[in-house]
């Protein structure tokens, strides 16, 4: 399964403007990553899972349902997160990027993840 997951996150960095991607469990453990620095991947994985979980709690609390995806915009880029079969797909982009295209590719990746992960 890990080889398939690695290929899925690698395919995402082919999108223009995407500089990194990783797949993490809701516990923050990294399943697959394209980040060169393993420590950075572990830190980003843990933080992404925590942020995703807190936003999910907030959306449920205010009555709009479970979190599906989130975009965090920063000065020099964005972090996109999407739930994929009990995992969280995280993509890091440059500032100037076609977010619609990135989200479309993330949805495709999510479908591939769902097919690869047993129910």
What are these regions (language model features)?
Residues 1-119:
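Non-catalytic interaction/Regulatory regions outside core domains
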């Amino acid at each position: 399964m890990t080889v398939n997951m690695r290929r899925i996150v690698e395919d995402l960095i082919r999108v223009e403007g995407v500089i990194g991607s990783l797949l993490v469990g809701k516990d923050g453990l990294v399943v697959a990553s394209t980040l060169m620095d393993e420590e950075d991947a572990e830190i980003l994985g843990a933080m992404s899972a925590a942020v995703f979980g807190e936003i999910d709690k907030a959306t449920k609390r205010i009555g709009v349902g479970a979190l599906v995806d989130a975009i965090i915009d920063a000065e020099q880029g964005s972090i996109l997160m999407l739930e994929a079969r009990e995992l969280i797909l995280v993509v890091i982009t440059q500032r100037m990027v076609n977010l619609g295209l990135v989200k479309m590719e993330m949805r495709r990746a999510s479908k591939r993840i769902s097919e690869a992960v047993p129910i």
